[in-house]
Amino acid sequence: MRLVIADCSVRYEGRLNAHLPLARRLIMLKADGSVLIHSDGGSYKPLNWMSPPATLRVREPSEELLADGVKEVWEVQAGKSDDRLVIHIMTVHSRLEHELGADPGLIKDGVEADLQRLLAEQITLLGEGFSLVRREYPTTIGPVDILARDANGATVAVELKRRGDIDGVEQLTRYLELLNRDPLLRPVRGVFAAQQIKPQARTLARDRGIECLSLDYDEMRGNVDTQSRLF
């Protein structure tokens, strides 16, 4: 495990592009090859990342980048796609490297991470003809749980909660406001998905043009006669 605190900018290049402007951030490099970019607030989730398998290459900046103050360029290449994470390092404030060893892992059941994985695998629960773009789509205010395309090719942002309340709708609203500024994505509509959705949250979502999807976790795990209700 390597932890680096640095002034940096980050660019994600792939099926969709994303950019984090210059700021002080924590860069986490794990032994499995994953790279995660964190800020000191906004969300416990990384702002951007590359999942394993991935390869990190550090190179010298070009003269143009040197003139802009870039000291190093880190390129993280995905092992199974053309996706790439490019990190421009301006100033390194701290470095820490430590071997953590094997971890037994955490067994979780029925939590949001599991719901996200299952919905990504069964993306047509959102509707006929839907396709997955990416789980944990990075934005400057935190990652969107699922980004998808509907049958017409329009972008759909999905926020997943175990229990859906007003805070979750507000969070999805902020994501939609940001994503709809991107000409490559807009128009982007939202789906608020949860095992249970409170009536107040459903009312607020409807008022903001956000669809609500009730998920049956047990049926999704078994994928037997799966029926979800889209309102």
Swiss-Prot record:
<keyword id="KW-0378">Hydrolase</keyword>
<dbReference type="InterPro" id="IPR048301">
    <property type="entry name" value="NucS_C"/>
</dbReference>
<protein>
    <recommendedName>
        <fullName>Endonuclease NucS</fullName>
        <ecNumber>3.1.-.-</ecNumber>
    </recommendedName>
</protein>
<dbReference type="InterPro" id="IPR002793">
    <property type="entry name" value="Endonuclease_NucS"/>
</dbReference>
<keyword id="KW-0255">Endonuclease</keyword>
<keyword id="KW-0540">Nuclease</keyword>
<dbReference type="GO" id="GO:0005737">
    <property type="term" value="C:cytoplasm"/>
</dbReference>
<comment type="similarity">
    <text>Belongs to the NucS endonuclease family.</text>
</comment>
<keyword id="KW-0963">Cytoplasm</keyword>
<dbReference type="GO" id="GO:0003677">
    <property type="term" value="F:DNA binding"/>
</dbReference>
<dbReference type="Pfam" id="PF21003">
    <property type="entry name" value="NucS_N"/>
</dbReference>
<comment type="function">
    <text>Cleaves both 3' and 5' ssDNA extremities of branched DNA structures.</text>
</comment>
<dbReference type="InterPro" id="IPR049173">
    <property type="entry name" value="NucS_N_sf"/>
</dbReference>
<dbReference type="GO" id="GO:0000014">
    <property type="term" value="F:single-stranded DNA endodeoxyribonuclease activity"/>
</dbReference>
<keyword id="KW-0238">DNA-binding</keyword>
<dbReference type="InterPro" id="IPR011856">
    <property type="entry name" value="tRNA_endonuc-like_dom_sf"/>
</dbReference>
<dbReference type="InterPro" id="IPR048302">
    <property type="entry name" value="NucS_N"/>
</dbReference>
<dbReference type="Pfam" id="PF01939">
    <property type="entry name" value="NucS_C"/>
</dbReference>
